[in-house]
Amino acid sequence: MTGFKIRKLEAFCFRYPLSTPVVTSFGRMNDRPALFVHAEDEDGQHGWGEVWCNFPPVGAEHRARLINEMLAPMFAGRAIDHPSEMFDYLTAATSVMALQAGEQGPFAQAIAGVDIALWDLFARRSKQPLWRMLGGTSGRMRVYASGINPDGSAQTAEKAMQRGHRAFKLKIGFGAERDHANLRDLRQLIGDLPLAVDVNQGWSIGPALEQAPKLEQFHLLWLEEPIRADRPWSEWHTLRDKITTPIAGGENIAGREKFAAALSEDILSVVQPDAAKWGGITGCSAVAREVVKAKKTYCPHYLGGGIGLVASAHLLAAHNGGWLEVDANENPLRDAFCGAVGRVKDGEIELDETPGLGIEPDLASIAKYRTL
């Protein structure tokens, strides 16, 4: 397949106001932002990507401007043989600016979304679904309903069950009494179906050592981000040695070297890179291979719009991982564009053979939510 040149690269920002905010142990989302990226080559072929932009609440538009005003001009006249070339080039070309501004995160997230769009375009040009281009043999995978808030958790889970979900993840870190009450309610509702919890980095090591062992009575699939991602590995080792519940994390790890370090510490049983937050397809596919090689479970993290969700599904199918995270909360910016991922049956979904990501977003259908 011959190389291509990008004729146009553009980011589009949207916000959907929530009737019920999404609550975590560190903050809340009063709307659901989505930052979509569209890349078009000189032959008229195109691809779509998405940038993580959940926090801070004012961050989505800033990342959109990084793409439109800084990254897009870097494509002028460049022939591209493979998306990974541009991932490496953009990362290197913006590294000093990101360091100077203290904005390594926003730049990495913007580049991740661009990378996803280039891979979609690349797979379309090769007339293959992305999951198969990346080496996958089946588009079928397990999914779980995520983002279950501490308020109305059983009702949210029940609605997810009605949509076909058979595995769930509850947000905790709101005090033992409240957390345990929600877990009891969920266990009563779902029985022995898989149930994970996410602390969202909400505990320091002291409370983690106190609270985590008490969760074992609920027979959890995993305990996600019990302490801050930047805490010393010694704290993670201490916690791991106190519990039998598998520990999950990875959404707040960025960079191949840092993922390699995490794997070498042998603490995380479930590794959760977020392709829209760091790495895109290029970086996260490489990490996923190392996760599987280390005999850990690869479960892509994702909480955003539909394009990034579908990209995460393709990564999971390509690397035969564990579970796909599907947000259980209302979000038309997700549901309008998630294709097969929205068709959950008995806890599973299946990607088809449509080239690229297999979706064709109609931005006109969500125009009233556009902010940039």
Where are these regions (language model features)?
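Structured beta-strand/loop patches that form or line metal/cofactor-binding pockets in enzymes
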Residues: 1-48, 52-56, 330-335
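Metal- or metallocofactor-binding catalytic centers and their adjacent structured scaffolds
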Residues: 3, 8, 40-125
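Conserved, mostly hydrophobic/aromatic
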Residues: 6, 37, 44, 71, ...
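A cross-domain feature marking catalytic cores of carbohydrate-active enzymes
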Residues: 51, 145-148, 170-172, 197-201, ...
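Metal-dependent enolase-superfamily TIM-barrel catalytic cores that perform enediolate-based chemistry
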Residues: 132-243
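Shared catalytic-loop signature of beta/alpha-barrel
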Residues: 213, 219, 227-248, 253-348
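C-terminal extensions of enzymes
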Residues: 337-372
